[in-house]
Amino acid sequence: MSLSGLGDTGKAEPPPALFPAPDSDAPAPARRRGGQPQNGPPRNGSVQGDDAGRQLVFFGAEAAEPAVADLAGLLAGPGEVVRMGGTARLSVQVDAAWRVHVLVAELAARGLAASWEPTEGERHAVRTSYTRVLKPLAAAWLHGSAKRPPATFHLTGRRLRLWLAAAGTPEPPDACLLRLGADDQECWEPTGVALAAAGLAGTLLGPADGGPAYRITGRRRLARLAELVGDPPRAAPPEAWPT
């Protein structure tokens, strides 16, 4: 199976208009196993105010430089982290080629080499190398082998941007679905609390209702989400990002 814009040979193929090839001036490239570097730049937009218009957004996507701590946004969703000795590796499965482009570039912007490969069900696995850089993140989120947010967990614009890029789906006209890890029940409730604290209170959908996921509804909440995550990445289809 060929990933749009990332050919099976490892060489870039002319991508469909829906999945534009990443810019050549993107951050450090990542490689598909046995392939050539692939890039995909994140593009952040401006953030202005909260959903009630009463205070500034202090945690929008442009409020700080990219940091490894932002990857907590992937772990709030379906991302996984595993430890090996004094190192750790983060991985996430996604359902579209544009998500691969965006996540590889976001990881590179944080100094993390990444690879990708196709998986079952026309999905794609994006993963970092094992690195000591991710050890603190793994220590905070892993309790034995179970993933659970630390007590201090909160959602910023950059964390939400990564979660949206990995597993977010707008549902016009006034909803957005943020998917969770199917086996991460211990994460679901505290993640909902963090969403509410960010002004994005959502409804938890169980597996029987098309989840697990949080559905964010209402124009004001969607405007808040759009403010926090910034402009869509270049590789994202217009309908795949809240505006």
Question: PLM ranges: what are they?
Answer:
Residues M1-T243:
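Internal intein/HINT superfamily modules and their associated LAGLIDADG
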